[in-house]
Amino acid sequence: MVINTTDPEERVINLSFVLGFIKEIFGLIWIRIYILIPILGVLIGLLVIVWLERKISAGIQQRIGPEYAGPLGILQALADGIKLLLKEDIIPSRGDLWLFSIGPAIVVIPILSSYLVIPFGRHIVLADLSIGVFFRIAVSSIAPLGLLMAGYGSNNKYSFSGGLRAAAQSISYEIPLALCVLSISLLSNSLGTVDIVEAQSRYGFWGWNLWRQPIGFIAFFISSLAECERLPFDLPEAEEELVAGYQTEYSGIKFGLFYVASYLNLLASSLFVTILYLGGWNFSIPSIPISEYFEWDSINGTSEVLGITMGILITLAKAYLFLFISITARWTLPRMRIDQLLDLGWKFLLPIALGNLLLTASFQLLLL
C-alpha cells in the first residue's frame, strides 16, 4: 500500500491506520499534540526572552547578569517562576475579590489567543483566518480591560491610576496600529497573515513591506512598543510615580501572570512585525537562493522537515531582532510623561498613520 498525500497530518493518521490503530483515537491524540506543541513553544520562547533581556541589560550596564542558575544563567527565568509559584497569594482586605482575581486572567488569555493566527510557515498556523491581523488587534484591545479591573479591584490609588493609564494608552495607540494594518492589507489584498507573507514573497527581499511602507513601519513599531508598555512607554507601572501601578497589591501567581503577559505580548508583537513588514518565514536575501533547497515537498520527507525547520528559525530570527531593539530601547530612552505619551499617540502617530493609509489607497487606485 502506497500512502502519498500533501498533508503531513493525513499521512501520519493513515500510517497509524495501517499499523492497526483506531483512526479516530489517533486523530484526537494528534489534536492534543497540535495544542501542546504551540504552548510549549510559547513557554520556551518566554524563558528565552527573559534570559536575553537580563543578559543584554547586564551588558549595557557593564554587569555580568545571571550566571549561576544553569549554564550562563539560562535557568534563571525558570527559578524566578518557581519562586513566584511558591509565594503567598495575598488579597487586599478592602478590595473587590472578584475583580482582583479575574483581572490577571483577562490580561493573559487574549494575548495567548493572538498566537493562533501567527504563521511560522505556509502550513504552520493554528488558525488561518481571513481576518487574522484584525483578530490580533481585536483580542489585544481586551487586555487593558483586565488591567483596569485589576487596578479598581485593588482598592489602591496607585493601582487605580495605573489601570486608568493603561486604558488611555491602549485607546491612543490601537488606532494607529489598526490604520497601519489597513495599509498593509491594501497592498496585499487580504487581512490573512499567511496571505500577507505570500504577497511579500513574490518580489523577494525588496518586496518586504518594510521598503514599501517605511512610514507605516515606523508608526507600527512605536505603537507596538506602547501597546506592550515597554520603556519609554511604561506609564501604567511607572515605579517612581505609581510604586508598581496596577501590580502594586499583587503577589504570587497573580503577579506572575502579569509578568508572563508582558513578555508574551512583546513576543507576539515581534512576530507580527516580522509577518507584516519583514517577509515572515521567507529568507529572501539576494544571492542566497536558500528557498530552492527547502521547498514544501510531499514526497521527500527530509526536505519537508528541513523546510519547516528553516521557516521557523527564520521567523524567530527576525522576531528576536525586533526584541533586541526593544530591550536596548529600555536602557537608552527616558520615560515619557503621560501627557507627552498621549500627545505622541493622538497628535503625531494618528495623523501619520492616517496619511499613510490615504497615500497607499491613492497609489492602489492609480494602479487599477
Curated annotation (Swiss-Prot):
Membrane topology: Multi-pass membrane protein
InterPro entries, A to Z: NADH_UbQ_OxRdtase_su1/FPO, NADH_UbQ_OxRdtase_su1_CS
One MF term in the entry's GO annotations: oxidoreductase activity, acting on NAD(P)H, quinone or similar compound as acceptor
Record EC number: 7.1.1.-
GO biological-process terms attached to the record: aerobic respiration; photosynthesis, light reaction
Enzyme type, top EC level: translocase
Annotated TM spans: 11-31, 33-53, 98-118, 131-151, 177-197, 205-225, 255-275, 305-325, 348-368
PROSITE patterns (alphabetical): COMPLEX1_ND1_1, COMPLEX1_ND1_2
Family from the record: Belongs to the complex I subunit 1 family.
PANTHER family named in the record: NADH DEHYDROGENASE SUBUNIT 1, NADH-UBIQUINONE OXIDOREDUCTASE CHAIN 1
Official protein name in the record: NAD(P)H-quinone oxidoreductase subunit 1, chloroplastic
Organism for this UniProt entry: Cycas taitungensis (Prince sago)
